[in-house]
Amino acid sequence: MARRLAATVALLTTVSLVTPISAFADAKKSVANIKCRSVKASAQTPMKVNPPTNLLKRGPRTITLSTNCGDIVIQTDFKAAPITLTVLSTLMSAGYYNRTFCHRVTNEGIYILQCGDPTGTGSGDPGFGYRDENLPKAVEDNYPEGTVAMANSGPNTNGSQFFIVYDDTTLGPNYTIWGRVTSGLDIVKYIAAGGVRGGGGDGQPLRTITIDRITIRS
C-alpha cells in the first residue's frame, strides 16, 4: 500500500498578518538562485538492511541531505524521537537513501516533499516497521514550515519514507516528527514551485530532486 498522507479538513481562522515586501523579495531571490544538476538516478529495489536491535546511546544532532540541487540540513530531536532516529541512522549509514528520488510533492491543501522510497513509487520500505513517537496535537498548522516527519500507511507503520514541510500544514496528528530544516528549505520550495508532472496538486515533482548521499553528525 502506498504510504500516502491524508489532508485533514479543519476550520481555519483567518488571521491578518503584516509581512514586509522585502521578505517576499528575499524568498523569491533565494529560490531563483537554486540550480539542480541533471541526474541519471533510476528506481531501485530497496536495499536489505537489518533493523537495529538497540537504541543509539547518542543520536545524530544534524543530518545533511546532499542532493543534486544542494544541501538540505536537518536539526534532529533525538530525545523526542529516539526510535525513529536510530532506525534512520541505520538506514542512512548503510547507504539506503543514496541515489534515490524524492518522489512526491503536494501544493494543494498540504505542502510537503516526500522522499525515502528507493522504488520511487511511494510503496517502498526497508521490510520492517516501528512505532510512532513525538506526535503533535490535533491543532491548526501542527506541521509548521520546516518540519521533517515520517510518512506512513497507518499507526505504527513507519519505514524509510519521510516528508519535509515547506509551508505551514495541518494534518491528522499521525506522523512522527523527528527534525526541522535549518538550511536548504529554499531547495524544497524550488521543487514545489515547479509543480507536479502532468499537472494537478499531488504527484511526482516536475523538477527532479535526488538524494546523492547523507551525512550524519552526532
Predicted regions and their residues:
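Cyclophilin-like peptidyl-prolyl cis-trans isomerases
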Residues: 2-8, 12-218
